[in-house]
From Swiss-Prot:
Originating species: Bos taurus
GO CC annotations, alphabetized: mitochondrial inner membrane; mitochondrial matrix
Role, per record: Promotes sorting of SMDT1/EMRE in mitochondria by ensuring its maturation. Interacts with the transit peptide region of SMDT1/EMRE precursor protein in the mitochondrial matrix, leading to protect it against protein degradation by YME1L1, thereby ensuring SMDT1/EMRE maturation by the mitochondrial processing peptidase (PMPCA and PMPCB).
Gene name tied to this protein: MAIP1
Record keywords: Mitochondrion, Transit peptide
GO molecular function: ribosome binding
Residues in coiled coil: none
The name this protein goes by in its record: m-AAA protease-interacting protein 1, mitochondrial
Extent of the transit peptide: 1-96
One example of a Gene Ontology biological process annotation: protein insertion into mitochondrial membrane
Length: 291
């Protein structure tokens, strides 16, 4: 019985299997062991196990063993390495330089601090609230000041170019008639000084706000705006009282002279019911330029 139990697995594994199934058999211990297992790579000696001493091999014997195997060809020769590497177009480059890199030109920014009269500031805020409460719910003195700044830059440019026909809907008729007589008689350098670039306007201030009714019951609001701007027009400094001269450095040698001028524009709007909600310029003043 014991012999049958020991032979049964071998009989089952040695029987031919149907179809494509492979035939399994038990491998012997000699077949399982690799021929080079347990051998040293240098001296081909069998490595001991347990308490057997490990054979010591000197560097001389190791060198003799390697030389006995014969010269070995390297995996890649220097020429083959160079040929296998991809070739890229050579670009001229400078790794070190003693020359100083040119520094970028820094822009000079002018900051002008203006301090308004505290009484005038409080008065302006009170009238702004009255306009918002009784006339226009969308009115804001901050937004109005920004719009007045853009209008000043646009109107002053047209005024310096004597394009009075384009100013008919922006300036009051009486004011425009007076401006025609004054501007046409100005020299060219004074005409150029009338134009204010929006980027050259350095300060804006609210001068005065007034609310009044006329005899017919119409409601009006007037807001006086004061502007300070820089101009490059060639005007003698003694020709304009109160003007300030600034020298703006553009580079290492170029120096541009600019003058700080002021102008006052009074904006007017009628809040009578049924009237177009448009702001017009009722007064324009350029000290010493338009007199």
């Amino acid at each position: 019985m014991a012999l049958a139990v020991r032979l049964l697995p071998r009989l089952l594994l040695s029987r031919p299997l149907p179809g494509w199934a492979a035939r399994l058999r038990t491998l012997s211990s000699a077949e399982v062991k690799r021929p080079l297992s347990g051998l040293c790579y240098l001296c081909r000696r069998r490595l001991g196990s347990g308490a057997a001493p490990f054979p010591r091999v000197s560097w001389a014997s190791a060198a003799l063993a390697l030389s006995a195997r014969g010269p070995q060809r390297p995996l890649l020769s220097p020429l083959e390495v160079a040929s296998t590497l991809p070739t890229f177009p050579s670009c001229p480059r400078r790794t070190y330089s003693t020359e100083e890199q040119p520094q970028q030109r820094q822009k000079t920014k002018m900051i002008i601090l203006g301090f308004s009269n505290p009484i005038n500031w409080v008065r302006t805020r009170i009238y702004s609230f009255l306009i918002w409460a009784y006339f226009d719910q969308e009115f804001s003195i901050t937004e109005f000041s920004e719009g007045a700044k853009q209008a000043f830059a646009h109107v002053s440019k047209l005024l310096s170019q004597c394009k009075f026909d384009l100013l008919e809907e922006l300036v009051a008729k009486e004011t425009l008639h007076v401006l025609k007589e004054k501007v046409t008689s100005l020299p060219d350098n004074h005409k150029n000084a009338l134009a204010a670039d929006i980027d050259e306007i350095v300060y804006t201030s609210t001068g005065d706000i007034s609310i009044y009714y006329d005899e017919k019951g119409r409601k009006f609001v007037n807001i006086l705006m004061c502007f300070w701007y820089l101009t490059s027009a060639n005007i003698p400094s003694e020709a304009i009282s109160g003007a300030r001269v600034f020298q703006v450095k553009l580079g290492d040698q170029n120096v541009e002279t600019k003058q700080l001028l002021s102008a006052s524009y009074e904006f007017q709007r009628e809040f009578t019911q049924g009237v177009k909600p448009d702001w017009t310029i009722a007064r324009i003043e350029h000290p010493k330029l338009l007199e």
